[in-house]
Every structure is written in structure tokens, then in C-alpha cells.
């Protein structure tokens, strides 16, 4: 692991392997270690960069939590690429990370070679979902990460995988319970106020794009992935069977093969 102070915040990251850079952006409320199966498989042929977003993992907390905007997460990563002297790169993000890379494309479209969206969506939240993010943020600051983590583990992965893949479940709980409640809450509030990427960004994306989703994802169901594909000009959709919201951990062999096949083809 390494650290860099960029955009006014300390960002923790790993950089592994040689080749064309591939940047992997984690979801909420996780950290860079969610990409371990991908780092192992991809670093033979790609230069893999896995940052902890601000407020997550070992990265710093924003000094002004109320002033954090969703685009700050993307600016941090772009500044990290500047720090690493990486001009162009492939980009993959899961869930919130998928929206972070949409914002990265909005800010710096010429730097991105391809986009890989995993278990994410582009449109605005419904009023109920938006309000729910604020409610959850307040809850995390009051209760900490423990109760929330125990409650959502059966939605993060398929319920049967909690027992049939105990290593995956333990890893998820470790990440979630190890996340700063303040960092997680800041991200929820910032995400609630993001722009409409479906209307404002997707129509501008012409580079090769891969959309992936777990067949049993409860947070971002297959219909959301299909909506992405319908609104992208140069897109392939892959549905990972027997996986929930985190196919890169639940079915990492199928996930990794789909990513590598896509990157080789472009």
C-alpha cells in the first residue's frame, strides 16, 4: 500500500503489475480490498490501481464534511492519476464506484480508454431513496457500522452465500464494520445530491463500455443494467448468474473472465 496527498486529502492506494493501467473503484461502504480477486488475476497483464475513496479504508476523512460534493470522489482519483503520471487508463467501478467513474468521465473523457460498470445505475434516486440515504447516514453516525453491516450482508451477497461462502461474508463484514461511520455518512449525503448521469453523461459516452450485474442483485437489479445498456452507444451487457450485488467476490471467475474478454477485444 502507498499514500498520496492529492486534492487536499490523503488517499491510500495499491499499484500492482505492469501494462496498461486499469483503475478499480470500490463501492459503499467498502474499501480497495474488495478487488483482491481481480488484482490477483489481472496484474499479470495490467497495471492495477485500487484506491480507497476519501473517508473509506485508510484514506483520510474530509476536513469539511458538510462541504463534500459527490464529484470530489472522482476528482481525488483523477488527481491520484496525475500524481502517478498516468495519462490514460481503463476504468471499472462497482455500485457507488460506478457512479464515481461516470463523474470521472464527465470531468476527463479524453483520459479514459474504456468503462466497466458493475452493479450500478445512472439515474437520479427516487425521492424515497434519496431521503433514505440521509436517514441511513444519520443512523451510521449514531449507531456505528455494526448493526447496519449485519442487517445488509444478506443483500450485499445472495443470502445463501453468507453460509456457503463464509470467507466472502467475513471479508465483507470486516470491510463494512471497519469503515468510518463518518466517512460512510458523508458519502451517502454526497451521493444523494449527485447529478443525473443518465441524462447528462451517458449520451456523451462513445468509448467501449461493459455493463455487468449479478442476476440476483437486490440493490441494482438487472433492469437497471439493461437501462444502462439501452443508453450507451458502444456497450456489452453481461449478467453474472448466481450472484448478488458483488459478483466480483461471489462469482469472481465469471466476473474476471468477462472483464478480461472485454479488454482483450478492445
Predicted regions and their residues:
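Active-site glycine-rich loops that stabilize anionic/oxyanionic intermediates
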Residues: 27-30, 95
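Alpha/beta-hydrolase fold catalytic core
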Residues: 1-22, 44-46, 82, 86-87, ...
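Short beta-strand/loop motif that positions the catalytic acidic residue
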Residues: 205, 211-213, 217
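Flexible "cap/lid" loop of the alpha/beta hydrolase fold
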Residues: 99-107, 111-149
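Catalytic active-site module of serine/aspartate enzymes centered on a nucleophile-bearing elbow/loop
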Residues: 235-266
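Conserved alpha/beta-hydrolase catalytic His-Asp/Glu region
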Residues: 125-131, 142-204
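Conserved alpha/beta-hydrolase "acid-adjacent" motif
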Residues: 218-224
